[in-house]
């Protein structure tokens, strides 16, 4: 899928291995991986950071191959899932950063333009999340309250 507000085509990307079984050299069991996922989530790690740290420290390439369920599902079962989806959270964080910059530099028209792009991306992303129930149906992004969502 191409980029929304730029000329990038989005062609490059990695593909998952065909064999879905955990590698023979993978040492941790499913229960150990689940415990580690919960421990890292309690420390405040996002699901993608959890996956990266499991890959780097324990050698778990794909959590789903070892445990049978994805990281976010493990977090939901244990009640540790984030309230706002990760991609939306990072977009809101970016909008808050640009907003803080614009309060110091009011004449930055390029920054204002990019803030509009980020906010439109946020609005477009919230629609499917509201429809499938990830977010509340009356959830709405407001730039005034965005810093409380990210904090």
UniProtKB/Swiss-Prot annotation:
All disulfide bonds of the chain are none
Q: Which CDD domains match?
A: Ribosomal_S15p_S13e
Specify one Pfam family.
Answer: Ribosomal_S13_N
Q: What InterPro entries does the annotation carry?
A: Ribosomal_uS15, Ribosomal_uS15_arc_euk, Ribosomal_uS15_N, uS15_NS1_RNA-bd_sf
Gene3D superfamilies documented for this protein:
4.10.860.130, S15/NS1, RNA-binding
Provide the primary localization. Answer: cytoplasm
> What does the record give under GO molecular function?
small ribosomal subunit rRNA binding; structural constituent of ribosome
Q: Where is this region: Disordered?
A: 1-20
| Record keywords | Cytoplasm, Nucleus, Ribonucleoprotein, Ribosomal protein
Please give the GO cellular component terms listed in this UniProt entry. Answer: cytosolic small ribosomal subunit; nucleolus; small-subunit processome
Q: Its GO biological process terms? A: ribosomal small subunit biogenesis; translation
Q: Where in the cell is it found?
A: Cytoplasm; Nucleus, Nucleolus
Q: How does it assemble?
A: Component of the small ribosomal subunit. Part of the small subunit (SSU) processome, composed of more than 70 proteins and the RNA chaperone small nucleolar RNA (snoRNA) U3.
The record's annotation in PANTHER family points to: RIBOSOMAL PROTEIN S15P/S13E, SMALL RIBOSOMAL SUBUNIT PROTEIN US15
The UniProt family comment states:
Belongs to the universal ribosomal protein uS15 family.
| Role description | Component of the small ribosomal subunit. The ribosome is a large ribonucleoprotein complex responsible for the synthesis of proteins in the cell. Part of the small subunit (SSU) processome, first precursor of the small eukaryotic ribosomal subunit. During the assembly of the SSU processome in the nucleolus, many ribosome biogenesis factors, an RNA chaperone and ribosomal proteins associate with the nascent pre-rRNA and work in concert to generate RNA folding, modifications, rearrangements and cleavage as well as targeted degradation of pre-ribosomal RNA by the RNA exosome.
User: Under what name is this protein listed?
Assistant: Small ribosomal subunit protein uS15
- Species name for this entry? Dictyostelium discoideum
């Amino acid at each position: 899928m191409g980029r929304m507000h730029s000329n990038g085509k989005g062609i490059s990307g990695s593909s998952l291995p065909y064999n879905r079984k955990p590698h023979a050299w993978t040492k941790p069991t499913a229960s150990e991986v689940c415990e580690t996922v919960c421990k890292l989530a309690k420390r405040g790690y996002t699901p993608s950071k959890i996956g990266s740290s499991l890959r780097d420290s324990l050698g778990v390439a794909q959590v789903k191959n070892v445990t049978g369920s994805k990281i976010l599902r493990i977090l939901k079962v244990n009640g540790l899932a984030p309230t706002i989806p990760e991609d939306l959270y990072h977009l809101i964080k970016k909008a808050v950063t640009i907003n803080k910059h614009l309060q110091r530099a009011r004449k930055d028209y390029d920054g204002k333009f990019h803030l509009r792009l980020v906010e439109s991306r946020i609005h477009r992303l919230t629609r499917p999340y509201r429809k499938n129930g990830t977010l509340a149906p009356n959830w709405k992004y407001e730039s005034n309250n965005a810093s409380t969502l990210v904090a």
